[in-house]
């Protein structure tokens, strides 16, 4: 069973798994490839397309460029490709691991899914990892990028591929952030500020793509200020509304600062207060749905906030999450990214 939440190619996306008779490839996709139409135009000189959807672009791109096709995709995704002719399977996870992808082997079979509970439903035994839990309870560590809190269940790390031929599993790294930044720095260090802003413009533009109604999530920080500034340059959608959640007292949150940032825009802002009772209720939801420990109060707060937004008919929120850390503005315990920045 496969279910993908789509925000673009809503009307043209074919059912999954998608079979491409021309290439002998079968694909399943979770996520979005924002530049799939650009990739399609590069391929039209070599292939005839039978659909307008994203999945056929993946099969044709993989047939043309092999593992190198993923470096051409801009977005967040987990992709599974099966070659009917060679009987080989490929699993791919996006550059930063936005979309999850888990796998396990049992009785000579390979199981994979975007949720651990789906592996259990498929017959994988649900046995807790004593070593992983002991390390978490003693040191609050989540283990290596390969590990989960369950015996025999692995996650494919961000920026990795997994090849399976029926006998052996071979992992391969297809994207390395540190290496990519180093190459930029060595080739044209004077262009780094310009290149960074180009990437930001493209990312903000991608976040506004699609037919679904969207909202803007603010948090009163540097990332929100930069996001709003870039959106003003690109052009604010008329229907866009902004939202900000807060806990505790209003004047101690970033709401007032966010309102000041929006003063020169036509964007209305709605304040959403997250109460103690909402957090306790959300914690109960998370305990039922999460197969691994959450990372703290912020996760519970965001989950409660997203639930409020969903009840109001919004399924997509745009924002600058993580940009503070990328710019070195916030230090997290055990975070090694500051030295890199």
Locate the predicted segments by residue.
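Cysteine-centered catalytic environments shared across enzyme families
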Residues: 1-284, 288, 302
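Residues at secondary-structure transition points
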Residues: 37, 103, 227, 297, ...
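Short, flexible loop segments at the rims of nucleotide/cofactor-binding pockets, characterized by
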Residues: 140, 292-298
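Short glycine/serine/threonine/alanine-rich loop segments
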Residues: 267, 292, 314
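Adenylate-forming
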Residues: 298-304
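Active-site adenylate/phosphate-handling loop in enzymes that bind or generate adenylated species
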Residues: 304-341
């Amino acid at each position: 069973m496969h279910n993908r939440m789509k925000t673009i190619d809503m009307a043209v996306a074919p059912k999954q798994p998608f079979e491409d008779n021309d290439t002998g490839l079968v694909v399943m996709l979770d996520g979005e490839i924002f530049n799939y139409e650009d990739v399609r135009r590069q391929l039209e000189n070599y292939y005839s397309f039978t659909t307008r959807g994203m999945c056929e672009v993946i099969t044709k791109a993989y047939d043309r460029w092999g593992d190198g096709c993923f470096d051409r995709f801009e977005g967040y995704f987990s992709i599974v490709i099966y070659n009917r002719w060679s009987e080989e399977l490929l699993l791919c996870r996006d550059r930063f691991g936005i979309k999850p992808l888990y796998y396990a082997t049992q009785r000579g079979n390979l199981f994979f899914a975007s949720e651990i509970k789906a592996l259990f439903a498929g017959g994988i035994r649900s046995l807790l990892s004593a070593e992983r839990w002991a390390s978490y309870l003693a040191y609050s560590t989540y283990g290596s990028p390969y590990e989960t809190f369950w015996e025999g269940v692995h996650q494919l790390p961000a920026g990795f591929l997994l090849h399976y031929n029926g006998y052996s599993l071979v992992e391969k790294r297809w994207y390395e952030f540190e290496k990519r930044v180093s190459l930029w720095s060595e080739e044209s260090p004077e262009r780094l500020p310009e290149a960074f802003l180009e990437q930001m413009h493209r990312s903000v533009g991608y976040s506004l793509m699609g037919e679904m109604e969207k909202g803007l999530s603010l948090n009163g920080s540097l990332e929100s200020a930069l996001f709003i500034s870039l959106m003003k340059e690109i052009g604010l959608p008329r229907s866009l509304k902004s939202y900000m959640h807060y806990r505790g007292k209003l004047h101690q949150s970033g709401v007032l600062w966010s309102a000041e940032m929006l003063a020169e825009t036509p964007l209305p802002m709605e304040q959403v207060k997250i109460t103690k009772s909402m957090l306790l209720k959300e914690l109960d939801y998370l305990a039922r749905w999460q197969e691994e420990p959450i990372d703290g109060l912020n996760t519970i707060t965001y989950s409660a906030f997203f639930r409020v937004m969903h009840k109001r008919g919004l399924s997509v929120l745009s924002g600058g999450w993580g940009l503070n850390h990328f710019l070195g503005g916030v230090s997290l315990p055990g975070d090694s990214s500051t030295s890199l920045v």
